Amino acid sequence: IYYFDSVRVNLGLFQHDVNVVWDLAPHDISIMDHVINRKAVSITATGADHLGNGLEDVAYLTAFYPDNIIAHIHVNWLSPVKIRQTQISGTKKMIVWDDNSPSEKIKVYDKGIEVIQTTDQIYNTLIQYRTGDMYCPKIPQTEALAFEMDHFADCIENDTQPISDGYAGLRVVQILESSEKSIKNRGKEIRL
C-alpha cells in the first residue's frame, strides 16, 4: 500500500459533547487500521472550531506508517455535500470505495506506476504508467449493524476471534487521543 485517503463530510449533525474527529473519524480509523494492518508510527492533525464552542467542526488527520505508507482522513460537519469515500493505492491496483453510490460502492482500478532505474546520464529514474481496466465487484447488500451483531454473536457462540477485537478498539482510541493532542498543538507530530 502506498496511501490510504478517506473523506467523511456532511452538513451537521453537530454534537455538543465531542468534536468532529471523535464523531466521524473512528469509522475511517478502524478501516485504516484493518486495511493497512500495521501499527501507525505517528500522527499529525489540524482542525478548526468555526462555531466558537470549543469543538472542532473540520479536521484533517495524517497517520504515518513504516515503509513510507501514509494515511489521510478528512472529517467535516460544514460540507454542503455528503461524501463518504476512501481511496487506497497500492503497488498493483487502486481501490475507490464510495458509500454514497447505490450500485457501485467499490471500484478496483488496474492502474499504477513502475519505477525503472536507468544508467542514463540525464535521468536516473523513469516512471512507467500502467493503465488497465476498472471493475466493480458485486458486494452483497447487508445492513452493517446487523452484520456486526451477527458476527459478535457468532464469536460468542463458537468461541472464535472477532475481526475487530479490543486491541483494534484500543488502537483507534490511541489515534483519536493523539489526534486531539496534535490539534491542540497546531499540528504537532505525536509519536504513537
Enumerate the predicted regions with their spans.
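A short, mixed-charge helix-start or loop-turn motif at secondary-structure junctions
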Residues: F14-Q15, D133-K138, P162
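C-terminal helix-rich "cap/oligomerization" subdomain common to oxidoreductases
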Residues: P137, A146-F147, H151-L192
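Generic anion/oxyanion-binding catalytic loop in active/binding sites
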Residues: V18-V21, Q141, N158
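Rossmann-like NAD(P)H-binding beta-loop-alpha module
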Residues: I1-S6
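A structural signal for well-ordered alpha-helical scaffolds and beta->alpha junctions
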Residues: A25-I29, D99-N100, L145, M149, ...
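Rossmann-like dinucleotide-binding domain that binds NAD(P)(H)
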Residues: V9-V81, Q87, S101, Y167
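NAD(P)-dinucleotide binding in Rossmann-like oxidoreductases
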Residues: H50-N53, D67-F147
